[in-house]
């Protein structure tokens, strides 16, 4: 079984290793109440300046419904990345439905800060 072809607009796409790291961190940030689920919520965190980074699903249908986020991320200097599966992203977010975009948010004194920074650097390396 081959993986479905990913829309070329979904750039940068995380590889398998980074996807696992991302989804683990998304799951932890959900436990620490540092996660906003959904494209609209992600947009709000960007506008308020409280987004650490944005994770989007490359298999959102149609993809255009989340393609305003990369532009906003670039304006606000927030790293963003695509993962292949909205189902996997939904599971990592702790909901039973697919999630096409989520935002890990800033929180003072967060225990996740070191992991968040290492993921931000990994995403920024993809963007270069």
Curated annotation (Swiss-Prot):
Disulfide bonds: none
Cross-referenced SUPFAM superfamilies: L30e-like
Main subcellular localisation: nucleus
Pfam assignment, any one: Ribosomal_L7Ae
Important for U4 snRNA-binding: annotated span: 96-128
Molecular function GO labels: RNA binding; U4atac snRNA binding
Region annotated Interaction with U4 snRNA and U4atac snRNA, chain positions: 36-48
Localization, UniProt: Nucleus; Nucleus, Nucleolus
Domain of life: Eukaryota
GO terms for cellular component: box C/D methylation guide snoRNP complex; nucleolus; nucleus; precatalytic spliceosome; small-subunit processome; U2-type precatalytic spliceosome; U4/U6 x U5 tri-snRNP complex; U4atac snRNP
Cross-referenced CDD domains: SNU13
BP GO terms, sorted: maturation of SSU-rRNA; mRNA splicing, via spliceosome; ribosomal small subunit biogenesis
Gene3D superfamilies per UniProt: 3.30.1330.30
Swiss-Prot/TrEMBL site (Interaction with U4 snRNA and U4atac snRNA) positions: 61, 86
Keywords: mRNA processing, mRNA splicing, Nucleus, Ribonucleoprotein, RNA-binding, Spliceosome
UniProt cross-references to PANTHER family, sorted A to Z: RIBOSOMAL PROTEIN L7AE FAMILY MEMBER
UniProt subunit comment: Identified in the spliceosome B complex. Component of the U4/U6-U5 tri-snRNP complex. Part of the small subunit (SSU) processome, composed of more than 70 proteins and the RNA chaperone small nucleolar RNA (snoRNA) U3.
Family: Belongs to the eukaryotic ribosomal protein eL8 family.
The protein's role, per its UniProt record: Part of the small subunit (SSU) processome, first precursor of the small eukaryotic ribosomal subunit. During the assembly of the SSU processome in the nucleolus, many ribosome biogenesis factors, an RNA chaperone and ribosomal proteins associate with the nascent pre-rRNA and work in concert to generate RNA folding, modifications, rearrangements and cleavage as well as targeted degradation of pre-ribosomal RNA by the RNA exosome. Involved in pre-mRNA splicing as component of the spliceosome. Binds to the 5'-stem-loop of U4 snRNA and thereby contributes to spliceosome assembly.
Protein name: NHP2-like protein 1
Record organism: Xenopus laevis (African clawed frog)
